[in-house]
Amino acid sequence: MKKIKAFLLTKSVGLYINFLSYVLPRKAFQLAYVFFSNPRSGKLQLESLPEILHTSNQEQLNLDGHTIQTYHWSGNETVILLMHGWESNSSRWEKLLTELLNTGSTIVALDAPAHGLSDGKEFNVPLYASFTELVIQKYQPKYIIGHSMGGITAIYHQYHYGNSELKKMVLLGAPSDFSIILHNYLKLLSLNNKIKKAFYHYTRERFQIDIDDFSGQKFLKSSPTQGMIIHDTDDTVVLFEEAKKLAATWKSATLMSTNGLGHSLHDEEVNQKIVAFLLEA
């Protein structure tokens, strides 16, 4: 019954936006963009912070009026940065964190825009990448692990900002093409072509990039960074085809497929292989 109600609500919202696109097109796109970019979960409250995050040194960084929440576990000179995905936060790394901390490494995690304890209502990849750049400047990690939208943000960051010190990058359930993400959203709400065109125009105007060019395949084409792509064949959030696209163009990366883990990829064996890949000579 809940699924039916959610389906009807979603389609009703899409129907309203489509109607609005003919009478108030600007308002229609604004509404569509809010639903697309404003996460509905993933926030944290300081008074009820998950225990794993309590064990860290917490610091808030500031960037152009934004507050960026970071978590820092001190260790040796090996610094690893963790980047979570959509409607999530840094606590999602709890099981992997245990494995990483056992190596004595220094671990840094950040909450994405509008997630965790970071402020704001809007999430977008360029903004997340700017958060990441500030954290990288401060902590200078040599290794990055990104899940889902954290993965594509790590790719975009490396392409846009460039970090010559980055040695290895691990992508977990990461999408390649932003056009696929948008297509799935438009399909979910059954939004019309007017809204699609508005998204393309807005992205070009605001971020100076065409949606069809916002592609991990293109960003990684000449990347010398060693990589590990981990993706589950049963992932229904980001299809396995996205991992195959990344692996086809990222020549210095290996693709590891799993079965039955879904999008989250929470698994002890996966975590052990990540640690082995990062710390092998």
Model segments located where?
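An N-terminal hydrophobic leader/cap segment in hydrolases
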Residues: 3-60
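Conserved alpha/beta-hydrolase
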Residues: 90, 97-119
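Alpha/beta-hydrolase active-site loop
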Residues: 122-142
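Hydrolase active-site cap/lid region
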Residues: 163-209
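Short beta-strand/loop motif that positions the catalytic acidic residue
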Residues: 222-224, 229-231, 235
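Conserved alpha/beta-hydrolase "acid-adjacent" motif
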Residues: 236-242
